[in-house]
Amino acid sequence: MKQPQQQPETRTRMSNWIDADDRPWGRWEEYLNEPGYRVKRIIVHPGQRLSLQRHQQRSEHWVIVAGSGLFTLDDSVTEVNPGDKVFIPVRGVHRIENPGDENLIIIETQLGVCDEDDIERLEDDYGRG
Protein backbone atom coordinates (compact mmCIF):
# COMPACT_ATOMS: atom_id res chain seq x y z
CA MET A 1 0.00 0.00 0.00
CA LYS A 2 1.32 3.40 -0.95
CA GLN A 3 2.02 5.72 1.97
CA PRO A 4 0.57 9.22 1.74
CA GLN A 5 3.15 11.84 0.92
CA GLN A 6 3.87 13.99 3.93
CA GLN A 7 3.77 17.73 3.50
CA PRO A 8 6.46 19.81 5.13
CA GLU A 9 5.25 21.52 8.26
CA THR A 10 4.74 25.22 7.77
CA ARG A 11 3.92 27.76 10.40
CA THR A 12 2.67 31.23 9.79
CA ARG A 13 3.33 33.84 12.42
CA MET A 14 0.27 35.96 12.94
CA SER A 15 -0.12 39.15 14.90
CA ASN A 16 -2.63 38.37 17.61
CA TRP A 17 -2.24 41.57 19.58
CA ILE A 18 -5.22 43.85 20.06
CA ASP A 19 -3.20 47.01 20.68
CA ALA A 20 0.47 47.92 20.44
CA ASP A 21 2.72 50.93 20.81
CA ASP A 22 6.32 51.66 19.91
CA ARG A 23 8.17 53.46 22.69
CA PRO A 24 11.65 55.02 22.82
CA TRP A 25 12.88 51.96 24.77
CA GLY A 26 11.17 49.30 22.61
CA ARG A 27 7.56 48.17 22.21
CA TRP A 28 4.56 46.75 24.06
CA GLU A 29 1.84 44.55 22.59
CA GLU A 30 -1.47 43.93 24.35
CA TYR A 31 -3.00 40.47 23.94
CA LEU A 32 -5.84 40.45 26.49
CA ASN A 33 -7.75 43.28 28.11
CA GLU A 34 -10.59 42.22 30.38
CA PRO A 35 -12.15 43.93 33.40
CA GLY A 36 -9.62 43.51 36.19
CA TYR A 37 -6.68 42.16 34.17
CA ARG A 38 -4.57 42.73 31.07
CA VAL A 39 -1.76 40.73 29.41
CA LYS A 40 1.08 42.31 27.42
CA ARG A 41 4.37 41.39 25.80
CA ILE A 42 7.06 43.99 26.51
CA ILE A 43 10.16 44.19 24.32
CA VAL A 44 13.06 46.25 25.68
CA HIS A 45 15.79 46.95 23.12
CA PRO A 46 19.49 46.52 24.00
CA GLY A 47 20.88 49.41 26.03
CA GLN A 48 17.43 50.78 26.88
CA ARG A 49 15.31 50.92 30.03
CA LEU A 50 11.79 51.80 31.09
CA SER A 51 11.09 54.82 33.25
CA LEU A 52 11.30 54.49 37.02
CA GLN A 53 7.57 54.36 37.73
CA ARG A 54 4.71 53.27 39.93
CA HIS A 55 1.01 52.53 39.55
CA GLN A 56 -1.72 53.47 42.03
CA GLN A 57 -4.40 51.00 40.91
CA ARG A 58 -2.71 47.85 39.66
CA SER A 59 -0.11 45.24 40.48
CA GLU A 60 1.98 43.50 37.83
CA HIS A 61 3.45 40.03 37.42
CA TRP A 62 6.35 39.73 34.98
CA VAL A 63 7.85 36.58 33.46
CA ILE A 64 11.17 37.01 31.66
CA VAL A 65 11.04 34.93 28.46
CA ALA A 66 14.15 36.09 26.54
CA GLY A 67 17.25 38.15 27.18
CA SER A 68 18.46 39.32 30.56
CA GLY A 69 18.01 42.51 32.50
CA LEU A 70 18.31 44.48 35.69
CA PHE A 71 15.03 44.76 37.59
CA THR A 72 14.54 47.51 40.15
CA LEU A 73 11.83 47.28 42.82
CA ASP A 74 11.93 50.05 45.40
CA ASP A 75 15.57 50.09 46.63
CA SER A 76 16.55 46.63 45.35
CA VAL A 77 18.18 45.80 41.98
CA THR A 78 18.14 42.17 40.80
CA GLU A 79 19.49 40.48 37.67
CA VAL A 80 16.72 38.65 35.79
CA ASN A 81 16.99 35.92 33.15
CA PRO A 82 14.61 33.72 31.13
CA GLY A 83 12.24 31.87 33.45
CA ASP A 84 12.50 34.40 36.26
CA LYS A 85 9.29 35.84 37.67
CA VAL A 86 8.83 39.11 39.54
CA PHE A 87 5.86 40.65 41.35
CA ILE A 88 5.30 44.41 41.46
CA PRO A 89 2.77 45.41 44.14
CA VAL A 90 0.45 48.40 43.83
CA ARG A 91 2.58 51.55 44.35
CA GLY A 92 5.84 49.58 44.02
CA VAL A 93 8.53 51.77 42.43
CA HIS A 94 9.99 49.76 39.55
CA ARG A 95 11.85 49.65 36.24
CA ILE A 96 13.59 47.17 33.98
CA GLU A 97 16.83 47.78 32.09
CA ASN A 98 18.38 45.82 29.24
CA PRO A 99 22.18 46.04 29.47
CA GLY A 100 22.59 43.14 27.02
CA ASP A 101 22.96 42.91 23.25
CA GLU A 102 19.65 41.17 22.46
CA ASN A 103 16.03 42.09 23.10
CA LEU A 104 14.69 41.58 26.61
CA ILE A 105 11.18 40.10 26.34
CA ILE A 106 8.71 40.08 29.23
CA ILE A 107 5.18 38.74 29.55
CA GLU A 108 3.32 41.13 31.84
CA THR A 109 0.03 40.41 33.59
CA GLN A 110 -1.62 43.43 35.19
CA LEU A 111 -4.23 43.00 37.94
CA GLY A 112 -6.57 45.76 39.13
CA VAL A 113 -7.63 48.87 37.24
CA CYS A 114 -5.57 48.48 34.06
CA ASP A 115 -5.43 51.98 32.59
CA GLU A 116 -2.46 53.31 30.58
CA ASP A 117 -2.91 56.64 32.40
CA ASP A 118 -2.13 54.95 35.75
CA ILE A 119 1.59 55.63 35.50
CA GLU A 120 3.63 58.01 37.59
CA ARG A 121 7.09 58.45 36.07
CA LEU A 122 9.67 59.30 38.73
CA GLU A 123 12.68 59.23 36.36
CA ASP A 124 12.68 58.98 32.58
CA ASP A 125 15.60 58.88 30.13
CA TYR A 126 13.38 60.18 27.33
CA GLY A 127 11.96 63.34 28.96
CA ARG A 128 8.44 62.03 29.50
CA GLY A 129 6.65 63.30 32.60
Feature-to-residue mapping (PLM):
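Double-stranded beta-helix
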Residues: 2, 6, 10-23, 95-129
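A short glycine-rich, His/Asp/Glu-containing loop-to-beta-strand
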Residues: 15-54, 58, 109
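A generic "binding-loop/recognition-motif" signal
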Residues: 48, 57-58, 76, 92, ...
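Short beta-strand segments
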Residues: 50, 76-78, 118-120
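Short beta-strand His + acidic residue motifs that chelate non-heme Fe in jelly-roll/DSBH
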Residues: 51-53, 71-72, 88, 94-100, ...
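Glycine- and acidic-residue-biased ligand/ion/polar-headgroup-sensing regions
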Residues: 57-70, 74-75
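Short acidic-glycine-tyrosine-enriched beta hairpin
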Residues: 75-93
